[in-house]
């Protein structure tokens, strides 16, 4: 018999097989990299009995009503019962589809199955390759409120040096993509997170419809081959991955202090999910037992002293504490206010201290060491309150004991609690202690189409100088020191939307901003 001819593999098929092999190599190497970034955790301590969850009435989601349709316009006979029933069934099916679209997805999700569709995100798991080796009223676009003249006129040498360094951060412009800056998610950016690795900037973005984008900003543009010498070769888009991990807005990211592979995300779909970068799987870390219970989660944080505990706030004015080693039904949930909590944070060095910001126009400090009351009245001890003229959007603790808030009275307020480590459990703070040390005029009127401006501290600054970032309605990102002095106003050519969601890398002087188009601005 004549020898069989080997099948000819097309260039496309060869490239596809190479991509599959590369993805497998990338994912298999992430665990090794994670061990280099963060050592293996100590053996788990004996499980302690968790406190019973306070009983409360769950909020039920309203069933979507079918859209009314005209029988006459649909050409149905008024007496045709069969056709009427058919129309009713079709309406019910559409209503069920609308309801299912906003229901959270339970169970484990493989990233390969929830990839966001679209040319910009067709790289899929390739985007995880970056983890290998781990004051006018209203906006005035382009008008600076902090200029080079402010830097030059600084008389204090230390402050001037810091201002020069922060103002010297350059806008990331490696990729000449349309619109100048990479698009991480399809819809408006609502949350950002920097992976804590210092080897390269890796940014996570969450949008208003539940998509999570991942981008490794260290990748270099690769010029595509071009056979025509008369025309310039096209530069391919950067590798960006986006996955539909939630069904509603992703409000917050948090990175495990002991596992470099673990990324936690929270959403208005009432769930907290853990993304395992090694396995490429998103698992449910917390969700109400009743799938119809609506518990929109506005923020999450984790105490540095206990990586198995996660704290979360909700739009229903509650604060929750959940041990990740136990079932969601064992979580403690406390009612703190009748109005929504827009943001909260834990003191990085004293994680039993919680600062909450609420629609009830208050900043409140709570102590998790002392839980008091019974039944629905059970809650952490309230240490102090400060009232603002309008609602407070976010409260952010620094590692040195400052709290920065943004509010709709167009103020950034900085509170100073240097002796927080000496507070006894449940000890009340005086009115004088709760007064802000500094108030900074700042336009916080975002309107409907811009994500709410929230201050975010650099968690562990290398230089030991506490500083935070916040979006600016004039299409900049502002950088402030703990004493309220402005250090920089970051901008650049081609920024056509407000980088409302601003984030500092935990240790490096890298600043990210996300806008309403799903695009990223990055200063390094």
Swiss-Prot record:
| Molecular function terms from GO | DNA binding
Q: Quick check: keyword DNA damage in the entry?
A: yes
Taken from the UniProt entry, a GO cellular component term is: nucleus
Enumerate the Pfam families for this protein.
Answer: WD40
**GO process terms (BP):** DNA damage response; regulation of DNA damage checkpoint
From which domain of life does this come? Eukaryota
User: What keywords are annotated for this sequence in UniProt?
Assistant: DNA damage, DNA-binding, Repeat, WD repeat
Show the ranges annotated as biased composition (Basic and acidic residues).
54-65
Q: Where are the WD repeats?
A: 184-225, 245-285, 295-332, 336-376, 385-425, 447-490, 493-524
Keyword DNA-binding present in the record's keywords: the answer is yes
Q: Where is this region: Disordered?
A: 35-79
InterPro entries listed in its UniProt record: WD40/YVTN_repeat-like_dom_sf, WD40_repeat_dom_sf, WD40_rpt, WD_repeat_DNA-damage-binding
- Quote the function comment for this protein: DNA-binding protein that binds to both single- and double-stranded DNA. Binds preferentially to UV-damaged DNA. May be involved in DNA-metabolic processes.
- Protein family per UniProt: Belongs to the WD repeat DDB2/WDR76 family.
Protein's name according to its UniProt entry: DNA damage-binding protein CMR1
